[in-house]
């Protein structure tokens, strides 16, 4: 073989090898779209100061949100919504405050010894005049337990105040000892709760706190026991006189109106038990005079009402 031909062959071989190398390099450098050939990054993650601050702020925000959720204070509106007694108390207390500021007389009408056969008529009359009152009930003076249940719940449903007076109203027995007194008060309290699910908070002693049946034990024994049950007791400073069975409706009317004229705040004693027809007859006229002639504000007793109590 001639020398020139050898050189040509060598040149072709070198060129071919060079071409193969270039092709191989191109294939190796071509990106792997599937990522399967990408080397995993096993280097440790380094959190920069900025990253750390951002993370910290995020964590703080999350913590703050948690604290806000768990520590949100109960608003006054939520409290009154949860406690309807408080809402009612505030309502009538504000009316009393406004009445005093306006120079109006305040009258609390109270009815003892129900619920009896006259109670439904009394409730209807109060409804007619848009008036709320207070009822101090006696268990044994109701015609039946079912009747008592209906009337007690009607009193509450109509937004009157339901208080306790006595289970038997037998003063000679009730005041003979502290144990006898406790039995009577506990019995009427539990009776009202059984029939209504309502826990009374106001009471009136049979005969009032100045009754001669109790003597000095009223102050030393009976009043402390009533207070220990969370009860507020109320006497009266105006009497209708309807405890006298021979009284007329005219006399009831005059006793109430004349008594109220002399006071800025009156707690009026009346009765809705059987035998007090004169009171039922006088009631519409009493309400008409108190509201339309004397511009009185008539309210039910609440826990904010200043008690009228006998001096000892």
Model-derived regions: residue spans:
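Active-site beta->alpha N-cap acidic-glycine motif
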Residues: 82-199
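Short amphipathic alpha-helical segment that frequently serves as the phosphate-/nucleotide-binding helix
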Residues: 17, 123, 283-284
């Amino acid at each position: 073989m001639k020398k020139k031909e050898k050189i040509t062959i060598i040149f072709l071989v070198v060129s071919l090898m060079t071409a193969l190398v270039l092709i191989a390099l191109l294939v190796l450098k071509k990106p792997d779209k599937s990522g399967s050939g990408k080397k995993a990054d096993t280097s440790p993650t380094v959190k920069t100061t900025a990253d750390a601050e951002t993370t910290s702020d995020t964590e703080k925000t999350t913590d703050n949100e948690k604290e806000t959720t768990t520590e949100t204070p109960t608003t006054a509106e939520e409290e009154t919504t949860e406690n309807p007694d408080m809402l009612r108390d505030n309502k009538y207390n504000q009316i009393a405050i406004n009445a005093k500021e306006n120079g109006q007389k305040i009258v609390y009408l109270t009815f003892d010894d129900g619920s009896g056969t006259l109670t439904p008529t009394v409730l209807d009359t109060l409804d007619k005049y848009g008036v709320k009152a207070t009822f101090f009930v006696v268990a044994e003076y109701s015609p039946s337990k079912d009747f008592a249940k209906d009337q007690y719940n009607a009193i509450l449903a109509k937004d009157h105040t339901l208080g306790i007076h006595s289970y038997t109203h037998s003063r000679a027995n009730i005041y003979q000892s502290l144990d006898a007194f406790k039995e009577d008060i506990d019995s009427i309290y539990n009776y009202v709760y059984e029939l209504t699910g309502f826990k009374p908070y106001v009471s009136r002693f049979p005969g009032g706190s100045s009754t001669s049946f109790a003597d000095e034990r009223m102050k030393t024994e009976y009043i402390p026991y009533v207070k220990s049950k969370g009860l507020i007791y109320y006497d009266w400073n105006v009497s209708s006189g309807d405890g006298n069975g021979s009284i007329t409706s005219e006399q009831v009317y005059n006793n109430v109106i004349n008594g109220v004229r002399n006071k800025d705040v009156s707690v009026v004693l009346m009765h809705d038990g059987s035998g007090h027809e004169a009171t039922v007859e006088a009631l519409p006229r009493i309400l008409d005079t108190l509201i339309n002639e004397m511009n009185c504000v008539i309210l039910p007793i609440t826990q904010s009402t200043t008690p009228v109590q006998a001096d000892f």
